[in-house]
Amino acid sequence: MSYQQQQCKQPCQPPPVCPTPKCPEPCPPPKCPEPCPSPKCPQPCPPQQCQQKYPPVTPSPPCQPKCPPKSK
């Protein structure tokens, strides 16, 4: 084996070291869904017409003279 042949034989090189795989970005935190819109209050019931608690007051009949007028 000549000196030149020995020179040519490169010692085995270790395979190139693969760079450590870069950690993938962590998943972004899930975005909170918009909170449910607060249910819109239905329009309040229109106020009920006041129920007359008492029957409407009938005007009292005009005063009648108790005594019939004296016939002259």
Curated annotation (Swiss-Prot):
Sequence repeat locations: 21-29, 30-38, 39-47
Cysteines joined through disulfide linkages: none
Family: Belongs to the cornifin (SPRR) family.
Organism: Homo sapiens
Bias (Pro residues) ranges: 33-47, 56-72
InterPro entries: SPRR2
Main location: cytoplasm
Ranges for region 3 X 9 AA tandem repeats of P-K-C-P-[EQ]-P-C-P-[PS]: 21-47
Protein name, UniProt field: Small proline-rich protein 2D
Induction: During squamous differentiation of epidermal keratinocytes.
GO biological process terms, semicolon-separated: epidermis development; keratinization
Compositionally biased spans, kind Low complexity: 1-11
Function: Cross-linked envelope protein of keratinocytes. It is a keratinocyte protein that first appears in the cell cytosol, but ultimately becomes cross-linked to membrane proteins by transglutaminase. All that results in the formation of an insoluble envelope beneath the plasma membrane.
Listed GO CC annotations: cornified envelope; cytoplasm; cytosol
Compartment(s) where it occurs, according to its Swiss-Prot or TrEMBL record: Cytoplasm
Spans annotated as Disordered: 1-20, 33-72
UniProt keywords, alphabetically: Cytoplasm, Keratinization, Repeat
Origin: domain of life: Eukaryota
